[in-house]
């Protein structure tokens, strides 16, 4: 099929090597796309330096002019990056021999103290942000309602391309503290397929259609 013949080596490796409950992702999911998170911004209003840190989400200079993602994983990730910014960007931390492992521990810290600190920080962010959103920030950036937004890289590219058509420049910055890699994938739900061969074939055909290079 198109997916097995055309899946990128990078996605195949990631889906083969990562597991949930002892099963590789590739056992039940077909990779669709991947990317990172960062800050899309208007360079006429926001400097690259200001956009290159998670602390921008609570920067009062952009009060009611920045959007944040409306989901737990992304908002908590950004908040942890902002709260721990000084530590994560310190020379001693960056020079650690086990830097990747330490960074993963810090960014995935779910201790009671950190959760409480994140909750309090996001309450402040709520007062500073234009909105917590999932999809509306693309239009808000293009129309100039906001000057910056927490964005997935795929949506950021789309937004920048649309802005270019209007001779309007937008840029994308990766926060210096850390970013995260996301993977989107397709799965067939057992409750939806339920041993129905026609539904299974239809689902597989849909995934194959999306996996065609021209699509």
Regions from the PLM with identified roles:
Residues 130-131, 147-152:
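Paired acidic/hydrophobic, glycine-rich loop segments that form the ligand-binding mouth/hinge
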Residues 62, 146, 166-170:
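Local beta-strand N-terminus motif with an aromatic residue
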Residues 31, 38, 147-148, 180, ...:
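A residue-level structural signature of the nucleotidyltransferase/glycosyltransferase Rossmann-like core
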Residues 151, 155, 162-215:
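Extracytoplasmic/periplasmic substrate-recognition and gating elements
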Residues 1-128, 133-136, 140:
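Extracytoplasmic ligand-binding site segments that recognize negatively charged/polar headgroups
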């Amino acid at each position: 099929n198109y997916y097995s013949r055309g899946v990128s080596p990078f996605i195949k490796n990631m889906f083969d090597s990562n597991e949930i409950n002892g099963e590789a992702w590739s056992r039940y999911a077909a990779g669709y796309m991947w990317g990172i998170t960062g800050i899309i911004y208007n360079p006429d209003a926001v400097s690259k330096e200001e956009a290159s840190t998670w602390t921008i989400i609570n920067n009062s200079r952009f009060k009611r002019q920045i959007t944040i993602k409306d989901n737990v994983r992304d908002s908590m990730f950004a908040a942890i990056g902002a709260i721990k910014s000084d530590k994560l960007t310190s020379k001693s931390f960056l020079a650690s021999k086990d830097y990747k492992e330490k960074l993963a521990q810090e960014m995935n810290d779910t201790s009671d103290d950190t959760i409480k600190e994140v909750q309090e920080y996001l309450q402040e962010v709520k007062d500073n942000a234009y909105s917590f959103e999932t999809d509306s920030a693309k239009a808000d950036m293009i129309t100039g309602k906001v000057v910056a937004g927490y964005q997935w890289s795929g949506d950021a590219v789309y937004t920048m391309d649309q802005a270019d058509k209007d001779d309007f420049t937008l840029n994308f910055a990766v926060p210096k503290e850390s970013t995260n890699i996301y993977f989107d994938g397709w799965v067939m739900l057992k409750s939806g397929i339920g041993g129905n061969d026609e539904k299974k074939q239809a689902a597989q055909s849909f995934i194959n259609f999306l996996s065609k290079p021209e699509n």
